């Protein structure tokens, strides 16, 4: 059998990435040529995945109600008259997510239980793509489509919400009839009576729920963002389940519109390079539920280049910096589809922006994304005033150092390819230009505390001293040995899978700068509580400048709850503020050793004494 999709005009030729792209992208510049190459590779990649889905589906679901060849035949017809529409369907982020998930299912013998739809229905998303292409191009035809949770999806357009809930059982089927131009509306045949789709699919009418497109940029030539609340694959790996969530309400859409316009204005005014990156690479925003202050939720996926999940933050600055961050993830995902930057086994390492150990690829992604964050705050802090400016200075100081430290790790790592080393070297040169930029004393001090805090908490959570060496160290202490002659203890990475969110003291530092009255209210509410929730009380004492009282609070807490991981780092910070150098250094630089030794020699005792003893022992070379 000949392949019915062999003639789609997206050319599967050789893609070449010039060295200048590495240089430009590392510096945050997305030239028109680089953008064209990113999207050309994505189209080729997804077309290959469509071929694979179609070939496998013929063998795995040959008798299904939605044969893949009928969808590909319709896509071919669309491609002959409007190849640009087929190109946009291939570039649609949901296409990549669906293709990867469906290929995994087609290559697996496992039968997934409900509510996961049967394989034929998941393959049927290909029919939804073809139907959307027919509607957009005016190609007449008839095609059957799957129904998931009363919804019929038309990617890049929206969805139809059927008026009646289908009976329990397998997903239902409907038929879409697309007429020739000028001969009437498109009809969705549901078995009893047809539903007419509106002539203008940009506007809601009846059961039709269109996607929202928002002109975020003051430049009319920049494409709008699509607020994606309809596609079943918008949540990346979630699949077509629980898709019947309500569409965005009018007030919700207006909230996104207002903040996106404000973010677009400030990006074009003060961050033109970042604005250009957004315009070239970020197309789809998937709204998430509102998140707490200073914890805007956002995510990207390597098979959904051009898309980002994010919650709507409070300010235009926070939305702008989140968009910059996610756009950089999309750029790097697109670049990694062109050439390898990392090869071989990837050790798990510390990343300041994550609570869990990350592979080398995660460090590269984070360093690139947070370089954009640091550069944003580097510029934006000078346009802000008073508390907002102090917070921006803090963010710049934190992420400037975090990125520089991570890039230093990457440059010494053996896993970078030649292209990867070129990219990281250029990114390092860009970040080095920020080193001498001054930051006011108060936010600079808080940034230093934040960085020390993040690393110390990570060490307590994910490093474990070699047990035999820790036992030998405990024996030396119990025997009254001089700590200077005690055995060295190396620590090994032992990830705690439950620890993925960085410690909450970062939120308190940001609150101290942005809204100190709110921090005072939290302090009064916390009172003098002791127990599992008491780290908040001790943390508030530390952040409000009562370091001596914070030391006592952490001591009390750890005596009763040594499992309070962040309290070990908090105690180290409080001791440093009071001038106790040896113990504080041990708690901030080797907290996992202090904790292990304390458990072996002085449970219930004074953790400061244990930390002081560890601080005078020889330190083993890092083998994290």
Where are each of the predicted segments found?
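Type-3 copper protein
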Residues: 1-286, 302, 309-311, 342, ...
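Generic recognition of stable, solvent-exposed alpha-helical segments in well-folded globular domains
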Residues: 255-258, 262, 303, 318-322, ...
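Short, flexible loop/turn elements at secondary-structure junctions
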Residues: 267, 271, 289-291, 312-314, ...
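Catalytic zinc-binding patch centered on the HExxH motif and its immediate surroundings
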Residues: 286-305
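Post-HEXXH active-site segment of zinc metalloproteases
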Residues: 300-303, 313-322, 330-361, 497-501, ...
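Post-HExxH zinc-binding segment in Zn-dependent metallohydrolases
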Residues: 336, 347-387
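Long, C-terminal catalytic modules of enzymes
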Residues: 358, 378-392, 401-412
């Amino acid at each position: 059998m000949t392949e019915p999709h062999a003639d789609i005009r997206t050319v599967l030729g050789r893609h070449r990435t010039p060295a200048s792209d590495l240089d430009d992208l590392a510096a945050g510049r997305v030239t028109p040529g680089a953008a064209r190459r990113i999207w050309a590779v994505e189209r080729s990649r997804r077309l290959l995945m469509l071929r694979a889905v179609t070939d496998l589906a013929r063998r795995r679901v040959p008798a299904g109600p939605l044969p893949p060849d009928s969808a590909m035949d319709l896509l071919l017809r669309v491609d002959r008259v409007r190849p640009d529409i087929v190109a946009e369907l291939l570039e649609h982020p949901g296409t990549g997510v669906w293709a990867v998930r469906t290929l995994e299912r087609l290559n697996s013998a496992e039968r997934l239980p409900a509510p996961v739809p049967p394989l034929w229905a998941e393959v049927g998303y290909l029919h939804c793509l073809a139907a959307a292409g027919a509607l957009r191009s005016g190609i007449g035809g008839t095609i059957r489509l799957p129904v998931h949770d009363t919804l019929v999806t038309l990617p890049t357009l929206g969805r139809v919400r059927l008026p009646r809930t289908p009976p329990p059982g397998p997903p239902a089927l409907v038929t879409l009839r697309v007429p020739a131009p000028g001969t009437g509306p498109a009809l969705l045949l549901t078995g009893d009576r047809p539903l007419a789709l509106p002539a203008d699919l940009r506007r809601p009418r009846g059961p039709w729920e269109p996607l929202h497109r928002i002109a975020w940029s003051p430049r009319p030539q920049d494409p709008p963002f699509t607020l994606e609340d309809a596609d079943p694959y918008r949540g990346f790996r979630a699949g077509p389940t629980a898709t019947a969530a309500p569409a965005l309400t009018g007030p919700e859409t207006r909230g996104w519109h207002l903040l996106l316009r404000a973010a677009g204005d400030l990006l074009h005014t003060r961050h033109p390079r970042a604005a250009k990156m957004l315009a070239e690479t970020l197309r789809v925003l998937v709204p998430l539920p509102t998140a707490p202050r200073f914890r805007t939720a956002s995510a990207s996926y390597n098979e959904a280049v051009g898309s980002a999940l994010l919650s709507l933050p409070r300010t235009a600055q926070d939305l702008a910096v989140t968009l910059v961050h996610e756009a950089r993830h999309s750029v790097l995902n697109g670049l990694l589809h062109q050439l390898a930057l990392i090869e071989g086994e990837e050790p798990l390492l510390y990343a300041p922006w994550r609570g869990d150990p990350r592979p080398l690829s995660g460090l590269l992604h984070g360093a690139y994304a947070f370089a954009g964050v640091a550069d944003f705050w580097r510029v934006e802090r000078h346009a802000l005033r008073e508390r907002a400016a102090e917070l921006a200075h803090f963010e710049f100081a934190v992420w400037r150092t975090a990125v520089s430290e991570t890039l230093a790790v990457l440059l010494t790592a053996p896993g970078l390819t030649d292209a990867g080393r070129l990219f990281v070297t250029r990114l390092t040169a860009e970040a080095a230009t920020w080193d001498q930029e001054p930051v006011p004393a108060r936010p600079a001090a808080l940034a230093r505390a934040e960085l020390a805090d993040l690393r110390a908490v990570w060490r307590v959570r994910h490093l474990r001293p070699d047990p035999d060496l820790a036992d030998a160290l405990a024996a030396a202490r119990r025997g009254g040995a001089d700590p200077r002659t005690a055995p060295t203890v190396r620590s090994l990475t032992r990830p705690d899978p439950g620890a993925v969110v960085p410690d909450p003291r970062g939120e308190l530092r940001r609150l101290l700068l942005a809204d100190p009255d709110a921090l005072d209210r939290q302090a009064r509410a916390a009172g003098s509580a002791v127990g599992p929730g008491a780290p908040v009380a001790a943390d508030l004492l530390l952040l409000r400048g009562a370091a001596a009282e914070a030391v006592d609070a952490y001591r009390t807490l750890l005596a009763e709850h040594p499992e309070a991981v962040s309290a070990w780092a908090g105690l180290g910070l409080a001791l440093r503020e009071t001038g106790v150098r040896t113990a504080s250094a041990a708690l901030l630089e080797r907290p996992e050793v202090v904790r292990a030794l304390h458990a072996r020699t002085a449970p219930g005792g004074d953790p400061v004494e244990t930390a002081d003893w560890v601080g005078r022992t020889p330190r083993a070379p890092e083998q994290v």
